[in-house]
């Protein structure tokens, strides 16, 4: 039995859950192991940290092979998509980035650059971060007051304007607080984890637009003829494991089932594929290391 979970399962935060899983396995005669990995190590330019867990029906666990596949940079990877592939006209956010988020139009005007030129220069980050870092928020607000005083993400009267958003950002940062950043997000060599708002504000590195659904499917390693029936199902893309990441883990399970896995003397093993290190282990016949409980102050 095996599955995939959040990166937190591999950290101190997940120790309680891991201890319970180990106990369940021991009760039914299974050893237990974990491996942490990143989809960038499985041939796809998406930085997606995940944890895989395994219950082995043997007294000890196998040593899983370290995984690494060469990946292309984001631009070259997206360019693999043929012109006739479906879902290239399906977007979470349609239209140009400069039309959807007017402060970005200000940035291009200020820089004197095209979208692709700015993306190559900026490389990674959000427009809100760019404005803050370069101390351009006051000037951008003045520009918006002149050109688009009423514009926001939506044309509804109740929607906050971009001026409101930037003033809110100013206030939050002046208080040393964070803020919700829904501005266009740029990526260079790799995309961030394809989840949540990145599906809405992830910008194409060449074209003045957001990613289309086919590009999202490709970033999950799905076949180029794989489709979805309804735009409302697009978020299902993010609720899965990238294909090559899952494939590499499945190969290890297959080796075990065929009797080809390299077995260890450990009843519990914690491997980190991102740095090829053994983080924790318990040898057969030994007691696990004692853990000291800390009372919560909350």
Regions found by a protein language model. Name each.
Residues 115-298:
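C-terminal target-recognition/interaction regions appended to catalytic cores
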């Amino acid at each position: 039995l095996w599955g995939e979970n959040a990166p937190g399962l591999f950290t101190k935060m997940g120790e309680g859950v891991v201890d319970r899983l180990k106990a369940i396995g021991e009760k039914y005669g299974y050893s237990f192991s974990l491996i942490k990995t990143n989809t960038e190590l499985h041939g796809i330019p998406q930085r997606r940290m995940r944890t895989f867990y395994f219950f082995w029906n043997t007294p000890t666990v196998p040593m899983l092979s370290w995984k690494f596949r060469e990946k292309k940079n984001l631009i070259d990877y997206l360019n693999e998509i043929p012109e006739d592939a479906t879902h290239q006209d399906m977007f979470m956010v349609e239209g140009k980035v400069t039309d959807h988020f007017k402060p970005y139009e200000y940035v291009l005007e200020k820089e004197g650059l095209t979208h692709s030129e700015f993306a190559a220069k900026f490389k990674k980050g959000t427009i809100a971060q760019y404005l803050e870092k370069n101390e351009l928020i006051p000037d951008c607000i003045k520009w918006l007051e002149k050109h688009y005083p009423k514009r926001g993400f939506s044309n509804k009267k109740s929607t906050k304007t971009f001026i409101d958003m930037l003033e809110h950002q100013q206030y939050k940062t002046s208080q040393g607080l964070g803020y919700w950043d829904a501005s266009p997000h740029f990526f260079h060599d790799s995309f961030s984890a394809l989840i949540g708002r990145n599906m809405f504000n992830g910008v194409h590195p060449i074209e003045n637009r957001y990613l289309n659904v086919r590009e999202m499917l490709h970033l999950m390693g799905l076949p180029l003829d794989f489709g979805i029936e309804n735009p409302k199902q697009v978020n299902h893309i993010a609720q899965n494991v990238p294909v090559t990441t899952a494939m590499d883990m499945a190969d290890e399970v297959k080796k075990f089932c065929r009797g080809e896995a390299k077995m260890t003397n450990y009843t519990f093993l914690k491997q980190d594929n991102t740095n090829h290190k053994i983080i924790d282990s318990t040898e057969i016949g030994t007691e696990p290391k004692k853990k000291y409980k800390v009372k919560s102050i909350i």
